[in-house]
Design a protein with these regions (language model features):
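A short SAM/SAH-binding and catalytic strip from SAM-dependent methyltransferases
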Residues: 240-259
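A short glycine-rich, Lys/Arg-flanked "PGG" loop and its adjoining helix->strand segment in the class I
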Residues: 261-277
Length: 499
């Protein structure tokens, strides 16, 4: 594959303060030192298809493997798209070049790019055939492991909706929601993109209605209310859920407000929109500025009484704020200039999408994102977990991760999970980095926990949990293993040795 830097990983705003000494602290693979990447010091290589959670895992990872139905839909996305936006042979031939041109407008030439670029037919075609397709893959893998609080009659809103990418991803990822009577406010500054998106969504519904019929079910397309406007525009109904995907990435680069001011404004608007027990799902590119912004919004929502449901395994200070906010007086370990983001490898993505990406010189082996899911419902379930105990021989690997259960079984599962957690007397931690080598023959992964910023370590061998765990894995670590005074000298993370 091409090594061309993907859009969401290339466009990185420089931090105001210089980075801390020791570049090996970075989470990015390309910033690792030769010592870290030396093959002689690494354990035997593990194939990408073998990198999965093992029995030590407790809880579901951030990303789920694509289900058979989801993979089929994503493989046939060009056919669904062709019903709304047919391309003749000449336009198909020009598509890779148009994608490459749009990529440069969204990155290198961003300052000169028009805000309403999706009103341009050529750019809309390039955007939907490349960015929408990739975003569907990202979102479907993420949404499979998030249990959204939606019921019959609910109103929800997706801001920066564009061609309804999030709505389409949710329809693909959550077949159990297809029978619910939901109304979605889809808000965007481009009316043409919204109209196009509604047609695309209906074409998707027609496709799943033909290929995914299940006994005793009747899929009904959700009611779409298109709203031409920006985040903050008044809506008629209070919302059970507010979502956005990549909207703020279009806003805060050119906003006169600081990130802190933008986060405060976001909190204020969210509180206007939501019902008392409403929830918020914000998804952004996996870049430092987006991670920093989401960390600030999370802090604002926690002050309003929200629970940080995912990906956070705790409701304390964010461990990855992408700034130096260590509370030295309290001794809380916080990462310096590291941000919360998660990656997945793309080998199970549609092959035609991978080929199109290569043709546009935008091939990628991995994709990433940052997100927060917060709920005002105190009973909201944080980090769904398997019903088997961590370390049990029956614990499922990531390739067979459990998907959200029907509502009728939700209470039963929560009870089992609470009992499981109590029996283990452990601390849930979320792996938030690639593999590093903090010492010879030692593997390390940075992690988030209620105890703060952690550096998990194991001996460097092929079957090490840190070598096999995927990004976003949730582990259950014995509380006795976390000694706050045992710190890494460079990063000040709490050192946690695992077997």
């Amino acid at each position: 594959m091409s090594n061309h830097t993907p859009f969401y990983e290339k466009f990185v705003k420089q931090p105001a303060k210089p980075r801390a000494a020791g570049r090996d602290e970075s989470q990015s693979r390309k910033e690792k030192t030769p010592q870290q990447t030396a093959s002689a010091a690494m354990p035997p290589p593990v194939r990408r298809t073998d990198r999965r959670n093992v029995a030590y895992r407790f809880g579901t990872p951030v990303f789920a493997p694509l289900t058979a139905e989801a993979k089929n839909i994503l493989d046939h996305f060009p056919d669904i798209l062709a019903q709304v936006l047919p391309l003749d042979s000449q336009k198909k031939q020009q598509l890779p070049q148009h994608i490459q041109t749009l990529f440069h407008e969204l990155t290198d030439e961003r300052s000169s790019r028009k805000t309403h670029y999706l009103n341009n037919p050529v750019k809309l075609s390039a955007y939907t055939h490349y960015y929408v397709w990739w975003n569907l893959v990202r979102l479907v893998k993420l949404l499979n492991n998030i249990e959204l609080p939606l019921k019959n009659g609910d109103y929800a809103a997706d801001f920066g909706s564009g061609p309804l990418t999030f709505i389409c991803a949710l329809w693909i990822a959550k077949p159990e929601l297809r029978t619910k009577a939901l109304t979605w406010y889809c808000v965007d500054i481009s009316h043409k993109a919204l109209s196009f998106g509604e047609e695309l969504f209906l074409a998707l519904c027609a496709y799943t209605g033909k290929t995914g019929k299940r006994a005793g079910t009747a899929e009904t397309p959700w009611r779409i209310k298109k709203v031409c406007g920006a985040f903050g525009i008044p809506l008629n109904e209070k919302l059970a859920l507010v979502t956005e995907a990549n909207m703020f990435n279009e806003v805060f680069w050119n906003s006169p407000l600081s990130l802190d001011e933008q986060a405060d404004k976001t909190r204020e608007l969210l509180m206007r929109y939501l019902q008392p027990q409403g929830a918020v799902l914000l998804i952004e590119p996996g870049i430092p500025l987006a991670g920093e912004f989401l960390s600030l919004v999370r802090a604002e929502l926690l002050q309003e009484g929200f629970a940080a449901v995912q990906p956070c395994p705790h409701g304390q200070l964010c461990c990855f704020p992408n700034r130096d906010t260590r509370d030295r007086a309290a001794g809380v370990p916080i990462a310096v200039h590291k941000w919360c983001h998660f990656t997945f490898e793309t080998e199970d993505s549609p092959q035609n999408l991978l080929k199109l990406s290569e043709a546009a010189h935008l091939g990628k082996a991995r994709a990433s994102l940052s997100f927060i899911f917060c709920s005002a419902d105190k009973d909201a379930e944080r980090n769904p977990a398997p019903t088997t105990l961590a370390g049990s021989d029956n614990t499922q690997p990531a390739s067979h991760a459990q998907y959200p259960l029907p509502a009728s079984r939700a209470a039963e599962r929560r009870t089992v999970q609470q009992q499981s957690t109590q029996q283990q007397s452990g601390i849930p931690v979320r792996i938030c980095s690639d593999i590093i080598m903090p010492a010879p023959q030692t593997l390390g992964r940075y992690a988030c926990s209620e105890k703060g910023f952690l550096l998990l370590t194991t001996p460097a061998h092929k079957d090490s949990v840190l070598n096999t765990a995927v990004s976003g894995t949730l582990l259950m670590v014995p509380e006795a293993a976390i000694q706050i005074s045992h710190r890494d000298k460079k990063t000040h993370a709490v050192l946690v040795p695992l077997e």
